[in-house]
């Protein structure tokens, strides 16, 4: 088995990475940053999202595991003091026999220059710079509503505990193949009327957002701002690809939710 390590620059993370490298070498597990079987992120959720985007062209070949060295992470099952357990598990419980797959977001942006495709692990949002955004919202090829407000966010189930939740979105179990559309500060009047609540679509449906004014529209994918001009429409659907996580030691999803937002156990 070959392992790649992606990490942030915190001092505690650097110490953990050096220790992890020693543990892997002791078990005879090779390190290969180019063509790994397993990508281990060391840091937090942001580090794992960076690791996902770094290796998104190899999703059919790689699995992910996360070690968090700071605050609780939804994608990081292991703490830095658990690394011996993780490496022992990798040596005795093969990755290909202990993995779970979660859905990703496929976003296609159509501009006057053509089409561009993006993959998101958490969410993709669309906004207008400095002014209110006006757009038509289509669901499954049928016109649904006229939107006016700060913007719209489409999230995956794993992303439902991130930005979408802060917008009032539902928390969705990551094994469900669905996408969720949430509004960002919508304005309702006689011309622009929205449903006013999050929308969850079926696996075979898709979401289309058509801005009324195509210039000065900003698209943000997993927190990264994408510079595009003359955005004519944006289509969202569940991606054919999925992200796979090393499942051995994988924490129960609702346990994570409780620990992150309630903490009364």
Curated annotation (Swiss-Prot):
Gene3D superfamilies, per the entry: Probable inorganic polyphosphate/atp-NAD kinase, domain 1, Probable inorganic polyphosphate/atp-NAD kinase, domain 2
SS bonds (residue pairs): none
Any one GO CC term of the record: cytoplasm
Annotated residues for binding of NAD(+): 45-46, 122-123, 148, 150, 161-166, 185
Catalytic site positions: 45
The keyword tRNA processing is assigned to this record: no
Protein name, as recorded: NAD kinase
Gene expressing this chain: nadK
């Amino acid at each position: 088995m070959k392992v790649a390590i992606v990490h942030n620059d915190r001092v505690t993370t650097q110490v953990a990475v050096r220790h992890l490298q020693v543990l892997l070498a002791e078990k005879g597990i090779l390190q290969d940053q180019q063509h790994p079987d397993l990508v281990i992120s060391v840091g937090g959720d942001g580090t794992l999202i960076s690791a996902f985007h770094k290796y998104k062209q190899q999703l059919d070949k790689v699995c992910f595991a996360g070690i968090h060295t700071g605050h609780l992470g939804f994608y990081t099952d292991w703490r830095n003091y658990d690394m011996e357990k993780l490496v022992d598990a990798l040596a005795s419980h093969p990755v290909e026999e202990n993995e779970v797959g979660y859905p990703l977001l496929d976003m296609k942006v159509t501009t006057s220059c053509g089409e561009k495709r993006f993959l998101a692990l958490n969410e993709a949002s669309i906004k207008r710079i400095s002014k209110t955004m006006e757009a038509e919202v289509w669901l499954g090829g049928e016109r649904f509503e006229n939107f006016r407000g700060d913007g719209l966010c489409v999230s995956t189930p794993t992303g439902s505990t991130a930005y979408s939740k802060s917008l009032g979105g539902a928390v969705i179990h990551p094994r469900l193949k669905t996408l969720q559309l949430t509004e960002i500060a919508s304005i309702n009047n006689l011309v622009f009327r929205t449903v006013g609540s999050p929308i969850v679509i079926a696996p075979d449906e898709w979401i289309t957002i058509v801005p009324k004014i195509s210039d000065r529209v900003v698209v943000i994918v997993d927190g990264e701002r994408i510079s595009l001009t003359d955005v004519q429409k944006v289509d969202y659907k569940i991606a054919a690809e999925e992200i796979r996580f090393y499942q051995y030691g994988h924490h129960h999803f609702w346990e994570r939710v409780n620990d992150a937002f309630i903490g009364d156990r």
